[in-house]
Structures are given as C-alpha cells and as structure tokens.
Regions:
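Short, flexible, glycine-rich and Lys/Arg-enriched loop motifs at helix boundaries
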Residues: 56-70
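NAD(P)+-binding Rossmann beta1-loop-alpha1 motif at the extreme N-terminus of oxidoreductases
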Residues: 3-60, 82
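Hydrophobic/aromatic beta-strand patches that form the interior of the parallel beta-sheet core
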Residues: 39-41, 75, 89, 115
Length: 128
C-alpha cells in the first residue's frame, strides 16, 4: 500500500499530524512529499517548538529521508488540525496520550482513522 499520489488523485488525503518531535515532523514532510494535504498540530504551550519554520511553514529533513516541504497548516487549534481530516496521526510519547485524547474529545468523527505510536495501550485511551 502506498500513500503517494498526485494533485487531483482521489487517493489524496487530508492528514492531521499531532506532535512536535522529530517523528511528527518527519511524517509530516514524508506525507506532504507524497502529495497529501498535511496539517501539523501542537498544543498552545508547545507551538513555540515550530518557531524555526513557522513563517515559511517549510520543514527540511536530512538523512535517510531527504526532503524539503511546505506544510499546509501549522496550528495550535485542534479544530483546524483535525476538522475534516481523513487520518489523524498522533506522534506523542506514552505519557501524553491522555492529554491528547482529552484535546481530541468532541473534535473527531467515526469516519476518521486514527493512528497512534507505542505500546502504552493508547488505543484504549482514545477509545474512551
């Protein structure tokens, strides 16, 4: 299965990436390079972590993934990030899943697909 597509392709998805670290930023760049609409979210108290690229919204990855992409939306507004997103990818440490689940409560729909990372029973947290 590939997520790569071109503009106008029905496979083009709106994807919200939640998190401020290297994994969230790399996933955002990779998905954008594959043609998707990408929304990168950080809560208000962490949005400063995006200050290096907040003006241009361009993130550059170096290493195994070499890419430089302009992210569609960088926001601390949860509705702007996840509203009408096809996929929500939560890239936070296990200790933050409860916090993010509370932020997402009431802002998601049954049609959206949520992806989480790590084995801290995150799926049970988001199910509730």
């Amino acid at each position: 299965m590939t997520f790569s597509c071109k503009k106008g392709d029905p496979a083009l998805k709106k994807i919200a990436v939640l998190g401020t670290g290297n994994i969230a930023q790399t996933i955002a760049v990779d998905l954008k390079a594959s043609g998707h609409e990408v929304r990168l979210f950080a809560p208000e108290n962490l949005i400063h972590r995006f200050r290096d690229f907040a003006d241009t919204q361009v993130i550059e990855c170096v290493g195994a993934l070499e890419a430089r992409e302009r992210i569609d939306i960088i926001t601390s507004d949860i509705d702007q990030a996840v509203g009408q997103a096809d996929y929500i990818i939560v890239c936070v440490t296990g200790s933050h899943h409860q916090e993010y689940a509370q932020m997402l409560k009431g802002h998601t729909s049954a049609e959206q697909i949520m992806v989480t990372f790590n084995g801290c029973m995150a799926s049970l947290i988001y199910k509730n």
